[in-house]
Amino acid sequence: QLDVNELDTSATFALPFFFNSPANLNRAPLLITPGFGLQLWDGPQTTAANNFVELPANTYDVFIDTAWNPQFTPLFGAELGIRVGIYTNWDELVWQSWRLMGRAIGTLNLTPQWQAKVGIVYLDRNQVKLLPAVGATWVPNANSRYDIFFPAPKAAWRFTQWRNRAVWGFIAGEYGGGAWTFNQSGNAGVTEFDYNDVRISLGTEMVPVTARGLAG
């Protein structure tokens, strides 16, 4: 049995980026997100019979994410992003502790309410490198949004607005997990560890109504 508890914190800054370009019809800002994550591991029980790897008590994520979601034409757009970070328990920092992730998704506006999506998500894990990204987004009105989308489906509803922020509630799915490096006790060298799962989450989020400033 393996248990993990996670704590993640991040803040998103929206910066002007090609605002006057004809390839950015929606004036999409460049989104910069520095973040930090902590994982608290419990298990698995290591015995001579199972030969499981003994995991560290803690691992950490330190990353910066950039994203840009331009609308190139009234029909075609994109969702682009790159994340670079260090994923380790800090016992020993090696080249494998660095990970580069990204996503490149093309969008097609079928109707004012429906948008089709297809692309790839690069995870840079030891076992799973790439995932296909395919699905559609349905926005029936200004107060609801449905992402029927692999690997991150989501349904969200806008409840109210507080100052310059819209308050949304959501239910979402996610292909979760990650990859870390650590120095295993009694083992010379660095161990690379993958953890993969499927997650369901409920929550609220506050989204700035304006396109600039601190968002997270």
Predicted segments — roles?
Residues 32-36, 80-82, 116-118, 146-148, ...:
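Membrane-embedded beta-strand positions of outer-membrane beta-barrel proteins
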Residues 43-54, 150-216:
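Outer-membrane beta-barrel translocator/channel fold
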Residues 1-92:
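Transmembrane beta-barrel domains of Gram-negative outer membranes and organellar outer membranes
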